[in-house]
Regions:
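A short beta-loop-alpha structural element at the N-terminal edge
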Residues: 5-15, 127-154
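C-terminal "cap" of GNAT-fold acetyltransferases
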Residues: 23, 28, 105, 109-135, ...
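Conserved active-site alpha-helix within GNAT-family acetyltransferase domains
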Residues: 66, 90-108, 229, 253-271
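Conserved GNAT acetyl-CoA-binding A-motif
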Residues: 76-89, 240-250
């Protein structure tokens, strides 16, 4: 039996230069599932994505998903992509195993927490306040560069990484500190800012919104003193005040201290994000 991809729509090419297309997964012309491939609007045309790969229940366990994934990679190669990205639900154990078998490496993960009523206040003796406009001007440049560097350190070409960082800040902070739904707070020690947390609200899926921690950092020499936990508790309080009951975040693979902190606060992994070079 032969497993192939059959287009279900014309190639989509929006004005931003991206591409996308949905395919049926077919075995001897019989439909057994579907998959969508696309270029990434933030990383640029050289980075592709495999999305919504699904094999119908009766045809699972027969290698259909493996062949479909490899065929989707070939489509992206034909579009000139040099890497492919995937995001797999954390509870989809077979799909995670398939990703590892096909050579994908975890790059980051998404985590989520259901917030209880009465979020505790930050520990006594730790001062937090809103970021000032003067602080924002210097912070924005540093934060954008740090975000890009995190991608570069995980194998993303510098041009793509900086494009991703610029697009994220442009889309999420169009009016800086005045951007609706945005809050950036700092933690202060002995009159000096030693950390920050940037929170907002985003749509996790159609009809489901949540608070979101876009960025959190504590100065290296001040880590291990409870400032990160204090900032995360502040993020919970800000999110509850905004009327949201969920708080999500994104954390890069290898950031073990941060992952342990989030897990200790009750966050669970919802998606594992992985990548693979297309040679």
């Amino acid at each position: 039996m032969t497993t192939t991809l059959r287009p279900t729509e014309p190639l989509q090419q929006p004005a931003d230069g991206g591409r996308s297309r949905t395919y049926d997964i077919c075995v001897n012309s019989r439909r057994v599932g579907s998959v969508r491939v696309a270029t990434d609007p933030d990383f640029g045309a050289a980075s592709g994505r495999i999305e919504r790969l699904r094999v119908d229940e009766p045809d699972r366990g027969r290698g259909r998903g493996t062949v479909a994934a490899l065929a989707a990679e070939e489509v992206l190669r034909g579009w000139g992509c040099s890497e492919v990205q995937i995001s797999v639900p954390a509870d989809a154990v077979p799909a995670l195993g398939l990703a590892r078998a096909l050579g994908y490496t975890e790059r980051s993960r998404n985590m989520l927490k259901e917030l209880a009523d009465g979020t505790p206040a930050p520990p006594s003796g730790i001062g937090v306040r809103s970021m000032t406009e003067e602080e924002y001007a210097a912070w924005e440049t540093r934060a954008r560069d740090s975000f890009a560097r995190s991608w570069i350190d995980r194998g993303v070409p510098e041009e793509q990484a900086r494009a991703k960082a610029a697009a994220s800040h442009r889309d999420l902070l169009p009016e800086g500190l005045a951007t609706p739904g945005t809050a950036i707070h700092v933690v202060v020690h002995d009159g000096r800012v030693v950390g920050h947390v940037w929170t907002g609200v985003r749509e996790l899926e159609p009809g489901v919104s949540a608070g979101y921690v876009y960025d959190i950092e504590v100065a290296a020499e001040q880590r291990g003193r409870g400032y990160g936990r204090a900032l995360m508790l502040l993020a919970e309080r800000v999110t509850r005040e905004a009327g949201e009951t969920l708080l999500g975040l994104h954390v890069f693979a290898g950031n073990t201290p941060a992952i342990r902190l989030y897990e200790s606060l009750g966050y669970r992994t919802t998606h594992v994000n992985s990548s693979k070079p297309l040679l």
